Design a protein with these regions (language model features):
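Basic, glycine/lysine-rich polyanion-binding surfaces/domains
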Residues: 1-168
């Protein structure tokens, strides 16, 4: 049994792990024209960049790779007095896109996350388990973006292929 979906490994992204209270993070990101999402486990998008609120005091900023140096200069000024931490983690993650009419079915096999739209609406973002490992799931138009630690990317790719083709 095959599914009406496509799964593709994505190219590199600039990824920043940001930790701190919401007011400190909002202040830091205001320089980029971002405001933090109104609710946890949600993302906001601006100019192809996505800010995901993924924990009580944790955010991820995802941006095109070519913006990494510019964002690093803006987000990590040489001022240790600021009360949030920003760590560049671009090399830590690999991203996959899962798109198509049956993207929900694919994700339901890969993860125990309740992806019904009432619980996981457009622009939702959450860490969950994917094939037994920790992964980030972002609801996108017609599907999902999924991030896993880079060392697991080949394994996750094989698992996704087995699910997609029904061979495994």
């Amino acid at each position: 049994m095959g599914y009406q979906a496509t799964i593709k490994k994505q190219g590199l992204l600039a990824i920043f792990d940001i930790k701190g209270d919401a007011s400190a993070v909002a202040k830091r990101l205001s320089k980029l024209g971002f405001s933090v999402p109104e609710n946890k486990n949600m993302a906001v998008e601006k100019n192809g960049q996505h800010l995901c609120w993924i924990g009580e005091t944790q955010w991820l900023l995802l941006a095109p790779a070519e913006k990494e140096a510019q964002l690093l200069d803006s987000l990590v000024p040489h001022d240790p007095a600021l009360d949030c931490r920003v760590v560049l983690v671009s090399d830590a993650y690999s991203f996959f896109s899962v798109r198509g009419n049956q993207a929900d079915d694919i994700l339901a096999i890969a993860s125990p996350l309740d992806i019904r739209r009432i619980n996981f609406p457009d622009n939702a973002a959450s860490y969950t388990e994917l094939f037994g490992i920790r992964g980030l799931v972002l609801r996108r138009q017609n599907g999902y973006s999924i991030a896993v630690e880079r060392s697991y990317a080949d394994m996750v790719s094989v698992y996704f292929n087995k699910v997609l083709t029904g061979k495994g």
